[in-house]
């Protein structure tokens, strides 16, 4: 349904539904299967399993933050084409959310207990970015996706050699994050200041340190 055909109440209800789906585990259907070459679950030691679960919890939290960011930006973006771009990217990343949840379940673990907090903070940041300007909003997305790609590549390097399953999931996510970055830049995203990029990285590091354990 086109954005312009929705009433304010409809848009609010749709936003609440999207928020709940982002923070409630296993509430989203995946439109694509896990991007893995085998259904075999790799054997991991207890220590390895805990470490991989910590990494996947970080990645799941990152996807929750991405949902909040995109939803917030779509809520305040001034241009309907930008709103549509934000919503399309958010919908594509729902699969990432589901893939991380699935792998966490396979590892006998769970998402971060602070998931609602991460979503709320990200929604607020996205809404502010969207209200400033389309160029800033899209630049914020581009920088976010670049930093997400960095930590995905770092996590791939930390995985146990036998955990090809997690590696393939993260590799597919990384490829799509970079595509979303290029899409944001192609739609007019502006480069952020060094201070802004540093602040975003600092906040992301705090999130990762917390989500790994909780």
Curated annotation (Swiss-Prot):
NCBIfam families according to UniProt: DMQ_monoox_COQ7 (NF033656)
The protein's name: 3-demethoxyubiquinol 3-hydroxylase
Family: Belongs to the COQ7 family.
Membrane topology: Peripheral membrane protein
Residues that, per the record, bind Fe cation 1: 63, 93, 96, 177
GO biological process, one term: ubiquinone biosynthetic process
Lineage, highest ranks first: Bacteria, Pseudomonadati, Pseudomonadota, Gammaproteobacteria, Moraxellales
Subcellular location: Cell membrane
Cofactor(s) needed by this chain: Fe cation
Keywords per UniProt: Cell membrane, Iron, Membrane, Metal-binding, Monooxygenase, Oxidoreductase, Ubiquinone biosynthesis
Primary location group: membrane
Family annotation (InterPro entries): COQ7_proteobact, Ferritin-like, Ferritin-like_SF, Ubq_synth_Coq7
GO terms under cellular component: plasma membrane
Cofactor binding summary note: Binds 2 iron ions per subunit.
């Amino acid at each position: 349904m086109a954005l312009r055909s929705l009433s304010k109440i409809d848009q609010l209800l749709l936003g609440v539904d999207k928020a709940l789906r982002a923070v409630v585990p296993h509430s989203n259907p995946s439109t694509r299967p896990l991007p893995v070459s085998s259904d075999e679950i790799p054997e991991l030691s207890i220590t390895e399993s805990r470490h991989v679960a910590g990494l996947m919890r970080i990645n799941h939290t990152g996807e929750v933050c991405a949902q909040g960011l995109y939803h917030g930006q779509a809520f305040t973006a001034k241009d309907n084409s930008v709103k549509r771009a934000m919503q399309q990217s958010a919908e594509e990343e729902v699969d990432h959310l589901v893939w991380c949840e699935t792998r966490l379940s396979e590892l006998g673990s769970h998402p971060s207990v602070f998931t609602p907090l991460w979503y709320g903070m990200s929604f607020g940041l996205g809404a502010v970015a969207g209200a400033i300007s389309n160029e800033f909003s899209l630049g914020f997305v581009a920088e976010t996706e670049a930093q997400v790609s960095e930590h995905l590549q770092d996590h791939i390097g930390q995985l146990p050699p036998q955990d090809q399953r997690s590696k393939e999931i993260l590799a597919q996510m990384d490829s799509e994050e970079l595509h979303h970055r290029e899409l944001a830049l192609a739609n007019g995203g502006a480069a952020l200041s060094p201070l802004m990029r540093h602040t975003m990285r600092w906040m992301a590091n705090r999130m990762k340190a917390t989500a790994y354990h909780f």
